[in-house]
């Protein structure tokens, strides 16, 4: 059975008379390894050899080979005062001490760069970034130079060219800046339209720097466009129902305050009605199918060229209603495209005001006034200054009036006695 060798070879300690070849042979046969314990039991254990156990390393070389290693190593006279490390050269010690103190004397000389390094080779490697024109970080360094020049001269946002997608601004020379994190106000303002009246083209001053809309602002603007588009479709049936009046059109436009800022680059007044809806229609046709704005017209367009109060053809999106708001069932206006200039004197452009016959529709007629008698009227009696003269005369009804069925009198009026009593009561009350 093979014996498991331990980390410390005790057979070499117990048998110092063996040759060095046997000491270095670790791949002995099983017979030699089993014979070693028998020799250890026969020979006495010297006490001097047991004292050398503490000088041996577990996996290191043998004690005979350790005497030659210190002679080959160079002396390390430069020791670190803060730790136990020693170095062969002075510059190695100086570089090591800077790891404890944090000193970085090697600063980058490139304008606009505030990087500092504790080693000169790190500075040399960093300088290649600025010297290489194809490097991404070199392009960032050039943009860092442009930003201070733009802010110092005070150029307007409309005059500046659009920057790169991820331009960073260098930090002050006394502070360290990270190249992967850019401050929120380091972007140069970018104009969505060439006009200066765009609400997003104005500059914002924060900590003495001008900034424009960043990624979060673009996201909020896109969300606002979607909400305005939803509100536009919500108010569209209500607007189309009152589409024939200019007041309803302006009211519906006031209900959509956000569409005017996103669809048009110049401001519109409330009187500029045609231009507003014309640009909204053109913008809706340019939109993509997946965009919040639909390709249908945002509102029915009005034709101011025609003198008619109603258009000749109502849009398909509007509800079906009669052009003339009158209860005549058979009245229809002729379409304008069928009329010519030569027939304008013979054929009227519009139908007559009252073309309906009496048989088609009859308005509720008021009862005809009663035939006035030759006596004084009721207003003349009431207007008399003397109160004693304010007396109603007894009504006198002729026989022909009582017999006629279509005279216009109510049945209660035909009774002369009841009318007389009513007249007497009225005189007493006056």
UniProtKB/Swiss-Prot annotation:
It comes from the Eukaryota. GO terms for cellular component: cytoplasm; nucleus. It holds the Pfam family zf-C2H2. Residues 30-46, 289-303 have a biased composition (Low complexity). Residues 1-77, 97-187, 265-340, 357-430 are annotated as: Disordered. Residues 97-106, 268-277 have a biased composition (Basic and acidic residues). Residues 1-19, 130-147, 175-187, 412-422 have a biased composition (Polar residues). Keywords: DNA-binding, Metal-binding, Nucleus, Repeat, Repressor, Transcription, Transcription regulation, Zinc, Zinc-finger. InterPro entries: creA/MIG_C2H2-ZnF, Znf_C2H2_sf, Znf_C2H2_type. It is found in: Nucleus. Coiled coil: none annotated. GO terms for molecular function: RNA polymerase II cis-regulatory region sequence-specific DNA binding; zinc ion binding. GO terms for biological process: regulation of DNA-templated transcription. A zinc finger (C2H2-type) spans 78-100, 106-130. PANTHER family: REGULATORY PROTEIN MIG1-RELATED (PTHR47428:SF1). Belongs to the creA/MIG C2H2-type zinc-finger protein family. This is DNA-binding protein cre-1.
């Amino acid at each position: 059975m093979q014996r498991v060798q331990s980390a410390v070879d005790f057979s070499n300690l117990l048998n110092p008379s063996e040759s060095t070849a046997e000491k270095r042979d670790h791949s002995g046969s099983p017979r030699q390894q089993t014979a070693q314990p028998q020799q250890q039991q026969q020979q006495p254990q010297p006490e001097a050899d047991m004292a050398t156990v503490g000088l041996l390393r577990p996996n290191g070389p043998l004690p005979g080979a350790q005497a030659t290693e210190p002679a080959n190593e160079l002396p390390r006279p430069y020791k670190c005062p803060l730790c136990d490390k020693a170095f062969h050269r002075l510059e190695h010690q100086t570089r090591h001490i800077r790891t404890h103190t944090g000193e970085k004397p090697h600063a980058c000389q490139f304008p606009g760069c505030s990087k500092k390094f504790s080693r000169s080779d790190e500075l040399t490697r960093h300088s290649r970034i600025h010297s290489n024109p194809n490097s991404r970080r070199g392009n960032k360094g050039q943009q860092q130079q442009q930003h201070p020049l733009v802010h110092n001269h005070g150029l307007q946002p409309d005059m500046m060219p659009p920057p790169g997608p991820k331009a960073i601004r260098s930090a002050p020379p006394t502070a360290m800046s990270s190249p992967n994190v850019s401050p929120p106000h380091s972007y140069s303002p970018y104009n969505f339209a060439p006009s200066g009246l765009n609400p997003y083209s104005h500059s914002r001053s924060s900590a003495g720097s001008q900034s424009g809309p960043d990624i979060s602002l673009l996201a909020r603007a896109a969300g606002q466009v979607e909400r305005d588009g939803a509100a536009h479709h919500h108010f569209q049936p209500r607007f189309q129902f009152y589409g024939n009046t200019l007041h309803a059109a302006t009211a519906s436009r006031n209900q959509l305050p956000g569409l005017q800022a996103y669809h048009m680059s110049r401001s519109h007044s409330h009187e500029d009605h045609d231009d507003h809806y014309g640009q909204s229609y053109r913008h809706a046709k340019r939109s993509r199918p997946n965009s919040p704005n639909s390709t249908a017209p945002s509102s029915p367009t009005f034709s101011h060229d025609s003198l008619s109060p109603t258009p000749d053809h109502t849009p398909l999106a509007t509800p079906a209603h009669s052009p003339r708001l009158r209860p005549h069932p058979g009245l229809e206006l002729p379409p304008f495209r069928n009329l010519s200039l030569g027939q304008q004197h013979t054929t009227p452009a519009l139908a007559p005001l009252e073309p309906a016959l009496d048989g088609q529709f009859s308005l509720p007629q008021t009862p005809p006034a009663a035939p006035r008698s030759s006596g004084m009227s009721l207003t003349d009696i009431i207007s008399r200054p003397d109160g004693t003269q304010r007396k109603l005369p007894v009504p006198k009804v002729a026989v022909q009036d009582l017999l006629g069925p279509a005279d216009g009198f109510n049945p209660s009026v035909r009774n002369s006695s009841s009318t007389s009593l009513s007249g007497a009561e009225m005189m007493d009350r006056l």
